[in-house]
A protein has these predicted regions:
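UBC/E2-like fold recognition across ubiquitin and ubiquitin-like conjugation systems
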Residues: 1-149
Length: 149
């Protein structure tokens, strides 16, 4: 087994046996793509939703980060509405091989708790979050009801 595969295998076993709170991880081929199901964090407008994140591993993982995208349609400043692409600033920039998937999952969850509006992929959503928080929250709740049940 290649070094990268050993690392992925080890992380997958750890995360499926003892997942972080609010996460379920599944995969048909653990060396390619994982299906990560994340519960919406408490005390956020995302609560009550379950969000599917596709985690795709490059051949040279852990030297390059996995590519995470939301398959569930999201309303968030750092997530592209049309593609589910996540802002690279969130976890890809500054990636080092000692970072783990568990760490990435914690970052993705914290992103829903406290959105970063400094470098948004969706500028209008970031502005709404900053200027009309109640409208932002209401739209998120609509998305949760419509797409994340």
């Amino acid at each position: 087994m290649q070094k990268a595969n050993k690392r992925i295998d080890k992380e997958y076993k750890e995360l499926t046996e003892n997942p972080p709170e609010g996460f379920i991880i599944k995969a048909e081929n653990i060396f390619d793509t994982w299906d990560v199901y994340m519960k919406g964090p408490e005390e956020t407008p995302y609560v009550g939703g379950t969000f599917l994140i596709k985690m795709k591993f490059p051949d040279n993982y852990p030297f390059k980060p996995p590519k995470a995208t939301f398959s569930t349609k999201m309303y968030h400043p750092s997530i592209k509405k049309d593609s589910g692409e996540i802002c690279k600033d969130i976890y890809e920039e500054g990636w080092v091989p000692t970072k783990t998937i568990k760490g990435v999952l914690e970052i993705l969850k914290s992103m829903l708790v406290a959105p970063n509006t400094d470098t948004p992929l969706e500028t209008e959503i970031a502005n709404e979050y900053l200027k009309e928080k109640s409208k932002f929250d209401a739209t998120v709740k609509e998305y949760v009801t419509k797409y994340a049940q």
